[in-house]
Amino acid sequence: MLLGALRMEERKGLMGRERDQFPVGMRVLAVDDDPVCLKVLETLLRRCQYHVTSTNQAITALKLLRENRDMFDLVISDVHMPDMDGFKLLELVGLEMDLPVIMLSVNGETKTVMKGITHGACDYLLKPVRIEELRNIWQHVVRRKFGNRERNNLDFSKECNKPQSADTDHGPYQPTCGSSDQNGRSSRKRKELHGEDDDEGDDNDYQENDEPSAAKKPRVVWSVELHRKFVAAVNQLGIDKAVPKRILELMNVEKLTRENVASHLQKYRLYLKRLGAVASQQASIVAAFGGRDPSFLHIGAFEGLQSYQPFAPSAALPSFNPHGLLTRTSAAAAFGLQELAAPSSTIQTSTGNVTVGHCLEENQQANLAQGLTAAIGQPQLQQNWIHQEGNGLSDVFSGSSLTNTLSSTLQRVPSSSLPPQELLECKQAKVSMPPSIRIPPSSSALLERTLGVSTNLGDSSISQQGALPIDGGFSADRLPLHSSFDGAVATKLDTSLAASQREIGQQGKFSVSMLVSPSDNLALAKNAKTGASSSGSTIILPLDTARHSDYLQFGGASNSLQKMDGQKQDHIQSSNIIWSSMPSTQLPSDTQIHNTQNQRLDSGSFNHNIGAHLADQTNASASILPQMKFDTRISEEKMKQKNTYDLGSSKLQGGFNSSGCNFDGLLNSIIKVEKDDLPFMDNELGCDLFPLGACI
């Protein structure tokens, strides 16, 4: 008992001596990024007889504290520092080591001070700091040290004041704190008790943590087979009516919840939406680059015409590509153009001035100018072809050898009639059209070619009504061109027309030649009048000029046929119409040829070569589209100036010249119809060789 009392006195004496010398030599760590403030703070602390260690970086201060935990008693740190905020340093020091920290700053706002205190600062000083404040900072060190010591002493006193158990050798009222062995045993018991509690707590925590993980649902992996069932269920219900509940019932898959199906359905709808966006983008690209698929095409306005507006393609009118409307080409390549332009059709005009006269009758037929704008009052105006009945040229194409040969290849296909108020009349338009007009293909399941009567190509027609009627000896038997030709047919056609070829060679004034091609070769012979064809057969249709001399010679004496024969046979005005077979999906307008009774051909000599390629087709969906070329010379003055006219080397003139019909008059004539017949001037050719699209 006496030994214990002596020890207590020694401890009190040591504590008394420390308390008497404590402020002197207190170890302080000063941290401030401002060197001036740091120097002032260090000087003031030294005046207070503190041992000072200064640094201008918070990271360096933290490193020093971690290396030597017992090296400092107090830390004074600035709040705002570049490398680390003062509050962050305060938190780290408070967590890692039990040292008092004093914050130092120029910001004295209550909010900032409150933040420092709540983060664990023992004091908050404002700059400039005073020495009086620094002299009292030691109290925080004492409070922290003696506060911890008092707590330890309190625990120690509680252990000593506990009553001793009855079975011990000591008396019932003797304290048990005098023996060190008893203190050791009590501390060990206390640690073991706390250790058991900690182990039980850890076990409970482990069980509690295992329960949420066990309650989690397994992740669903959408395999290929599972996705197929999902897609089949969605297709059966419909994408608009598909709901997760019904999809789950149709799929009938175990361990698949409604939430899984709902999530997958949402992703599937987003996938379909992205596919639709990609498809629309591809359609726009195809339309921009002139694709031929009608579902992707949206036709724009015609180039240079403000009155035409874009219109969508329909089944009645195939799509039209305006980019190929007017393109220049040389006349020298007129004969070779058939071989180069197989996938598309071109109309090339090689002429100086061609007078195009459109005459109207009340019993007009066929279609024209579909897709004119709503600005002129007719948003869906049908194309009006100009026809005029004429009985004078009923037997223009004569020859007994052609009667039986072409009986199986020709058929009359009349055009559909339209009301007279939708017909178009254009008085006279002088057109100088050297550019080639590209006619995109037009879809047709069957093409039945009719010479002299009509050719109805689905939405397009090439007719010569009245000019070449069928009662001149031609039969109406049809020959669908999707069936193949053979060599016997070509030989028969060539043999039956040999005499007619010799006869027309002697006349040399007006000839019509048709080339029948039994194969897919679309190349036309360069000289059509010789009857040579790369396909093998040639049909020559002679003209009975004696019966129709009134159509071939009229006007002034200078243009008479006898005068032309007397001057030179080389002065021949030729017009080549070349028809080429090709797959067709687009055709903007139709082409007609009319030679009516009141039309006059004022040229002295007229040579008309017509060639038609009928290609062997095995596919029923393929069709043949006429490809036409016009090379015309009319002016007699030009014929007098030159001795020889070369049909393949005529110079083309570009542009559009309108003397008798302008755009305003052309559009006004759609609404107001003039039904009077129009006379034709001498020395000019008046015929309906061009549709409205060609005039424009």
Swiss-Prot record:
CDD domains in the cross-refs: REC_typeB_ARR-like (cd17584)
Q: Region labeled Disordered — which residues?
A: 154-214
Extract the coiled-coil ranges from the record.
none
The subcellular location is:
Nucleus
Q: What are the BP-aspect GO terms?
A: cytokinin-activated signaling pathway; phosphorelay signal transduction system; positive regulation of DNA-templated transcription
- MF annotations from Gene Ontology: DNA-binding transcription factor activity; sequence-specific DNA binding
Q: Give the matching SMART domains.
A: REC (SM00448)
UniProt's post-translational modification comment states: Two-component system major event consists of a His-to-Asp phosphorelay between a sensor histidine kinase (HK) and a response regulator (RR). In plants, the His-to-Asp phosphorelay involves an additional intermediate named Histidine-containing phosphotransfer protein (HPt). This multistep phosphorelay consists of a His-Asp-His-Asp sequential transfer of a phosphate group between first a His and an Asp of the HK protein, followed by the transfer to a conserved His of the HPt protein and finally the transfer to an Asp in the receiver domain of the RR protein.
For whether the record's keyword set contains Amino-acid biosynthesis, the answer is: no
Instruction: State the Gene3D superfamilies in the record.
Output: 3.40.50.2300, Homeodomain-like
One Pfam assignment? Response_reg
When the coding gene is removed by deletion, what phenotypic consequences does the entry describe? Dwarf, narrow leaf, lesion mimic, low tillering, late heading and low fertility phenotypes.
- Which keywords does UniProt give here? Activator, Cytokinin signaling pathway, DNA-binding, Nucleus, Phosphoprotein, Transcription, Transcription regulation, Two-component regulatory system
DNA-binding region, residue range(s): 214-273
Which cellular component, as a GO term, is one annotated location?
Answer: nucleus
Compositional bias (Acidic residues) = 195-211
4-aspartylphosphate: modified positions = D78
Q: Which residues form the Response regulatory domain?
A: 27-142
> At the top level of its lineage, which domain of life is listed?
Eukaryota
User: Which ranges are annotated Polar residues under compositional bias?
Assistant: 176-185
Briefly state the protein's biological role: Transcriptional activator that binds specific DNA sequence. Functions as a response regulator involved in His-to-Asp phosphorelay signal transduction system. Phosphorylation of the Asp residue in the receiver domain activates the ability of the protein to promote the transcription of target genes. May directly activate some type-A response regulators in response to cytokinins. Functions as a response regulator in response to cytokinins.
Q: What does the similarity note say?
A: Belongs to the ARR family. Type-B subfamily.
What's the protein called, per UniProt? Two-component response regulator ORR22
**Organism the protein comes from:** Oryza sativa subsp. japonica (Rice)
